Amino acid sequence: MASEFKKKAFWRAVIAEFLAMILFVFISIGAALGFNFPIEEKANQTVGRSQDIVKVSLAFGISIATMAQSVGHVSGAHLNPAVTLGCLLSCQISILKAVMYIIAQCLGAVVATAILSGITSGLENNSLGLNGLSPGVSAGQGLGVEILVTFQLVLCVVAVTDRRRHDVSGSVPLAIGLSVALGHLIAIDYTGCGMNPARSFGSAVLTKNFTYHWIFWVGPMIGGAAAAIIYDFILAPRTSDLTDRMKVWTNGQVEEYELDGDDNTRVEMKPK
């Protein structure tokens, strides 16, 4: 673990997560700010709200796809603690790198939200993209929504980035971006769609409002962990040997292996 800490590539990856997170949050939350959703649901207002939801969803999805294409080769472009946790559990990164990524993501989100706070200071009712529960949505329901939308995102990420596969066609960043957009189309009306604890953290810090903030950490982390475990142990199994996993978690990324067609085969993992 100490040897990885000294590598330049390690710090380049952490810096890439920080900078890409700033751009992602600035673009996506910036697209959402200024939309004053009406209280009364008249016909023309409902159409306007639907259009705004599509705008925000596309902004989140396209910005993630853009950042993934830009820095994916440097850091993997996680840009989400839930994705980082999923990659950790599927033995794609070490524990040290996961911790540093999450710190970088949270700091990047705070910086981006602070920039937006200055730029949009003249907006009325400026929530800075703060996540919260819609009227009539309970904490348990909101938690369930966050778990499910993050589950589909992390399942997509670990599946399309599985280096043992050779059947992935098309653009991987685009697939992940569409998954992010899909999650927002589903969840915006219920929770504002967190699906990303760091993104939610930035807004909560700048607005000093942590009401129900735990939902936007617990939900995505449960969803991300569940997706990685189900993919890694059921859908496309690797080794179940804890010793091998511990070596990867302490020494870094694993080598590439072929995904055997036999459902009963476990793929051995070794640290580089």
Swiss-Prot record:
Glycans are attached at N44, N125, N209. InterPro entries: Aquaporin-like, Aquaporin_1, Aquaporin_transptr, MIP, MIP_CS. The chain crosses the membrane at residues 18-35, 53-71, 98-119, 140-160, 169-188, 215-236. Disulfide bonds: none annotated. Residues 36-52, 120-139, 189-214 are extracellular. Its main location: membrane. Belongs to the MIP/aquaporin (TC 1.A.8) family. Aquaporins contain two tandem repeats each containing three membrane-spanning domains and a pore-forming loop with the signature motif Asn-Pro-Ala (NPA). This is Aquaporin FA-CHIP. It comes from Pelophylax lessonae (Pool frog). The lineage of its organism: Eukaryota, Metazoa, Chordata, Craniata, Vertebrata. The gene is AQPA.
